[in-house]
Amino acid sequence: MTTTIDGNEVGDGIREDVSDSVETLREEGVTPGLATVLMSDDGASKTYVSMKQQACDELGIESYHHEIDPEAPAEVLFDRIDELNADPDVHGILVQMPVPDHVGERAVLNRIEPEKDVDGFHPENVGRLVAGNARYKPCTPHGVQKLLEAYDIETEGKDAVVVGRSDIVGKPMANLLIQRGPGGNATTTVCHSRTQGLDEKTRNADIVVAAAGVPEMIDAEMLSEGAVVIDVGINRVDANTEKGYQLVGDVDFESAKEKASAITPVPGGVGPLTIAMLMYNTVKAASLQSGVDVDLP
C-alpha cells in the first residue's frame, strides 16, 4: 500500500508551531517582520510574493512589501536592501527571484545581511549549512526533511539520490541528507543533466528526491520496489483545462505510485512546506536577533 504524503497537513502543523512562537515573541514586545522585495513584472513572481504576504498575515508576522521598477539601476535595489538591513523591525529579507540581468542574483544574495537571509542563500549561510551548523536551512530542502520526519521515514544508512543540482534545492538537499543527526546520515548521490545512467542510479536508491524541473522524468521503471519518492518539481504543461495547462511534478505520479512505498503529489506535496519553512525561518530570525527564546522544533 503506497502512502501519499500530505504536505498540507504537515505544513499546517508547522504553521501552528510558528504561530505559538510568534505569540511568545509578541508577549516579549517583539513582532517578527519579513520584508519582501519584488523587482519584476513576472506574474508568477507576484503570485509567490502575495502568498508569502498572506502567510505572514495569518500567523501574526509583520509583512513589509517593496516593489522596484525592473528598469531601475541595480543601485536602487541595493540601497533598499541596505535600508532593510539596518531596520530593526525587519528580521528577514526576501528578494523574489528572478531579478533583472543587469542586477544579478549573486550580487543580491551577497548584499543581504546573513542574519536576515531567511532563504539561507548568503554565502555565509551556505557555508554554515555545509559545515553542519546551519543558521537557516533553505526552505524547500528543510521542508522535505520535515515531511520525511512527519511520516517516520528513516534516512540513516539509506541510499538517497537527489536529481538536480540547483543552489535552491539540489545542493542544499544533498547537504542536509549527509549531515549527522535526524533527517541525515544518508549515503547521497547527486545527479544532473550530465549524469550517465541516471535510471540505474535511481533504481538503486531507497529515497529519490526529484528536483530537476523536467516534467514527469521519473517513472516506475526508474525506481526500486518500495522506494520513497519526493517530488519537488512543479511544471506547467499544456492541457485541455479551463486554464489551458495543468501542474505536474518531475515524477510521473500515476506510474511511480505503483512501486513507491511513499510519494508526494504535485500539487499538495512539497509546495506547502516551502512557505511554512519561510515563516519558520523568519520567526527563528526574530528570536536570534531579539534574544527571546522560542520553542521551534
Predicted features along the sequence, with ranges:
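Positively charged, low-complexity intrinsically disordered leader regions
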Residues: 1-30
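Anion-binding alpha/beta catalytic cores of soluble intermediary-metabolism enzymes, centered on
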Residues: 94-155
